[in-house]
Amino acid sequence: MTEQKRKLEKLTGVKGMNDILPQDAGLWEFFEATVKSLLRAYGYQNIRTPIVEHTPLFTRGIGEVTDIVEKEMYSFVDALNGENLTLRPENTAAVVRAAIEHNMLYDGPKRLWYIGPMFRHERPQRGRYRQFHQVGVEALGFAGPDADAEIVMMCQRLWEDLGLTGIKLEINSLGLAEERAAHRVELIKYLEQHADKLDDDAQRRLYTNPLRVLDTKNPALQEIVRNAPKLIDFLGDVSRAHFEGLQRLLKANNVPFTINPRLVRGLDYYNLTVFEWVTDKLGAQGTVAAGGRYDPLIEQLGGKPTAACGWAMGIERILELLKEEHLVPEQEGVDVYVVHQGDAAREQAFIVAERLRDTGLDVILHCSADGAGASFKSQMKRADASGAAFAVIFGEDEVTNGTASVKPLRGTGDDGEKSVQQSVPVESLTEFLINAMVATAEDGDD
């Protein structure tokens, strides 16, 4: 068999990095439109950072002994200049880097939001992918518990806007650095007493990041973790006042919550408030949004000491919930599908289609698949399949008479039959279609 005749191997996407196909894109667009409207209502501004950042941004910002930095980052050396680069595994550090680099905080606090793909090298499973998408907010320059409460309440409002139920809020306080240090000493002492019962992961974290042992999912360690010293018992007056202030605001705004003393988060930059929104509808991957306060991070990345808080949520997980609860909106078709037969009709169809688009109507103009003109019957099948509200038809008679034939494709008339085809002068076509679209929408509301 010659090289030319040998069948080429079919190329596929990278495992854990998924295509978003047209039949799924409508749900993504619905979520994105909903969340963007919400963020505008809270005065947040969009920021877009590169997918690739210098690796030290994450090792310094997230923490060298976190799972993300140790095991999950896609890092490489740039062949052009030898720089160590990484596909972003999260976006808080990148937003902070941008705020520092562009001196964004010189005139006061900023409310920022982002949306886009993140990358982590881990085993793909439901709700956890190697390329995944997050939307997140960063409130930079706000020190009080009121900012914490506001970003938590934003999530609550989003669940309501989407129609989601059964997502529960868990909160905790990680206190200040000196309080965590005192707790760390006692926690290590306690875990050392049970060292023979710890699994490999807990053994590895015992002296590098013992707080993360409290977050273990291993059933065999749950009793040990349950009886471990609680960080909340080491909080000083400032930390307690902050945490109590958050709780008062949440209660005043009817936001139910549970205090979870084991909630520690997987990133080293957090202090004081941490929170997660969790559900039992996604199996082991139950966290759909998480965040908290990260006051040390801006100084840690080279900026002036600045308070900050934020959250991120996994879009794929939220879309899974929308499907689980049958909240997927019906995708609407275009307004008009233009059908034509003959060269003169095709020219007229092009002109009219552009004119209709000028008025804001969504229009598909039939184009042949094989370069030859398709039959009227096959074009009408395509028009029906497109989900369009109306077919606008041009043939020899229509071109000669300066008209278009308009056929409704959705619904039925008052007699239960499909609405009849009408001949409309071309100069009146736009007005006719707009009025017909309004009438169709009103009928649908009845």
Swiss-Prot record:
<dbReference type="InterPro" id="IPR036621">
    <property type="entry name" value="Anticodon-bd_dom_sf"/>
</dbReference>
<keyword id="KW-0963">Cytoplasm</keyword>
<keyword id="KW-0030">Aminoacyl-tRNA synthetase</keyword>
<dbReference type="InterPro" id="IPR015807">
    <property type="entry name" value="His-tRNA-ligase"/>
</dbReference>
<dbReference type="Pfam" id="PF03129">
    <property type="entry name" value="HGTP_anticodon"/>
</dbReference>
<keyword id="KW-0436">Ligase</keyword>
<dbReference type="InterPro" id="IPR045864">
    <property type="entry name" value="aa-tRNA-synth_II/BPL/LPL"/>
</dbReference>
<dbReference type="InterPro" id="IPR004154">
    <property type="entry name" value="Anticodon-bd"/>
</dbReference>
<protein>
    <recommendedName>
        <fullName>Histidine--tRNA ligase</fullName>
        <ecNumber>6.1.1.21</ecNumber>
    </recommendedName>
</protein>
<keyword id="KW-0067">ATP-binding</keyword>
<dbReference type="GO" id="GO:0006427">
    <property type="term" value="P:histidyl-tRNA aminoacylation"/>
</dbReference>
<dbReference type="GO" id="GO:0005737">
    <property type="term" value="C:cytoplasm"/>
</dbReference>
<dbReference type="GO" id="GO:0004821">
    <property type="term" value="F:histidine-tRNA ligase activity"/>
</dbReference>
<comment type="subunit">
    <text>Homodimer.</text>
</comment>
<keyword id="KW-0547">Nucleotide-binding</keyword>
<dbReference type="InterPro" id="IPR033656">
    <property type="entry name" value="HisRS_anticodon"/>
</dbReference>
<keyword id="KW-0648">Protein biosynthesis</keyword>
<dbReference type="InterPro" id="IPR006195">
    <property type="entry name" value="aa-tRNA-synth_II"/>
</dbReference>
<dbReference type="Pfam" id="PF13393">
    <property type="entry name" value="tRNA-synt_His"/>
</dbReference>
<feature type="region of interest" description="Disordered">
    <location>
        <begin position="403"/>
        <end position="422"/>
    </location>
</feature>
<comment type="similarity">
    <text>Belongs to the class-II aminoacyl-tRNA synthetase family.</text>
</comment>
<dbReference type="InterPro" id="IPR004516">
    <property type="entry name" value="HisRS/HisZ"/>
</dbReference>
<dbReference type="InterPro" id="IPR041715">
    <property type="entry name" value="HisRS-like_core"/>
</dbReference>
<dbReference type="GO" id="GO:0005524">
    <property type="term" value="F:ATP binding"/>
</dbReference>
